[in-house]
């Protein structure tokens, strides 16, 4: 089977994607697969470079990768791919839309407002949220462009910066609590990981710098673990995820708040999902096999 490892892309997370792709290539079973590295530098590259592969193993992140566009292109080309489908990918990439769905389903997520232009900034709404606040690009991952702000001046300055990353911004109530992440594979939960870091926020640098964070598998108290597991699986189902996903949460006063759901979480040595899988006895090469096998089954079930 010719496995195309799709990496690169046109988003701000291109370098993260290349790290993920190289890690996958180094650990795929060379006796089982013919591996075809495919680095995208522009959108049209996919159509030409992927035409002779049997399966696309996606190592992409951010826009044109994690947002459903590549998934839709591959479906048009008749090439099965890894992870969630086009619809789920697009929903999860849009923080505002995904939070609306989670709120509708009764899943706790921090209060927020969405902003598409500076002129629409409503200070009465901000006062209801209360500082500090978290400013995020509506579409993005790896905490790129994310910052905690403590007053209106800092907020306005950060909004100007984030609008350079994205046309929509999410301003979210800051939840100070215990940061955890829940990885799900084929509808089943992997061990929960706690994240403690030297930086105030688990930002881009912290995510890819082992020295700045402590990530460890934890056993939560039974009642809290049940709430966390229930919330993470509810997210996975409500947002129509498939194959694998990672649900990031903040726990405060015994309540798990969902921060976001990642349909193509990082897969480098420093990444959380592989660490969680390893804690469950699934080594990295085996995890890649399982992603390929499960994705092929799911695509078939979808009528692909």
From Swiss-Prot:
Residues 99-293 form the ATP-grasp domain. It comes from the Bacteria. Mg(2+) 1 binds at residues 248, 260. Pathway: Cell wall biogenesis; peptidoglycan biosynthesis. Keywords: ATP-binding, Cell shape, Cell wall biogenesis/degradation, Cytoplasm, Ligase, Magnesium, Manganese, Metal-binding, Nucleotide-binding, Peptidoglycan synthesis. ATP binds at residues 126-181. Its cofactor is Mg(2+); Mn(2+). Pfam families: Dala_Dala_lig_C, Dala_Dala_lig_N. It catalyses: 2 D-alanine + ATP = D-alanyl-D-alanine + ADP + phosphate + H(+). Binds 2 magnesium or manganese ions per subunit. PROSITE patterns: ATP_GRASP, DALA_DALA_LIGASE_1, DALA_DALA_LIGASE_2. It is found in: Cytoplasm. One of its GO terms (cellular component) is cytoplasm. GO terms for molecular function: ATP binding; D-alanine-D-alanine ligase activity; metal ion binding. Its EC number is 6.3.2.4. Coiled coil: none annotated. It is an enzyme of class 6 (ligase). Mg(2+) 2 binds at residues 260, 262. Belongs to the D-alanine--D-alanine ligase family. NCBIfam families: D_ala_D_alaTIGR, PRK01372.1. Cell wall formation. This is D-alanine--D-alanine ligase. The lineage of its organism: Bacteria, Bacillati, Bacillota, Bacilli, Bacillales.
């Amino acid at each position: 089977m010719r496995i195309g490892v799709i990496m690169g892309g046109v988003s701000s997370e291109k370098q993260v994607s290349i790290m993920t792709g190289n890690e996958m290539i180094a650990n795929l079973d060379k006796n089982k697969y013919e591996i075809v590295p495919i680095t995208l530098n522009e959108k049209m590259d996919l159509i030409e470079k992927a035409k002779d592969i049997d399966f696309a193993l996606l190592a992409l992140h951010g826009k044109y990768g994690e947002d459903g566009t590549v998934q839709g292109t591959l479906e048009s080309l008749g090439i099965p791919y890894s992870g969630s489908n086009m619809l789920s990918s697009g929903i999860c990439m849009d923080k505002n839309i995904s939070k609306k769905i989670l709120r509708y389903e009764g899943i706790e997520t921090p209060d927020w407002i969405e902003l598409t232009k500076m002129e629409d900034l409503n200070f009465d709404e901000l006062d209801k949220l209360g500082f500090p606040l978290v400013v995020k690009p509506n579409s993005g991952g790896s905490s790129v462009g994310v910052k905690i702000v403590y007053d209106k001046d800092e907020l306005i300055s950060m909004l100007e910066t984030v609008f350079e990353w994205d046309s929509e911004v999410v301003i979210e109530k800051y939840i100070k609590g215990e940061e955890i992440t829940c990885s799900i594979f084929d509808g089943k939960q992997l061990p929960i990981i706690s994240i403690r870091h030297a930086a105030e926020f688990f930002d881009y640098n912290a995510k890819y710098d082992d020295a700045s964070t402590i990530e460890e598998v934890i056993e939560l108290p039974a009642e809290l673990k049940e709430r966390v597991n229930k919330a993470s699986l509810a997210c996975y189902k409500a947002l129509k995820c498939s194959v694998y996903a990672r649900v990031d949460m903040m726990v405060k006063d015994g309540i798990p708040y969902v921060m976001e759901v990642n349909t193509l979480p990082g897969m480098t040595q420093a990444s959380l999902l592989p660490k969680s899988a390893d804690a469950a006895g699934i080594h990295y090469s085996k995890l890649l096999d399982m992603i390929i096998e499960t994705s092929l089954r799911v695509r078939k079930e979808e009528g692909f």
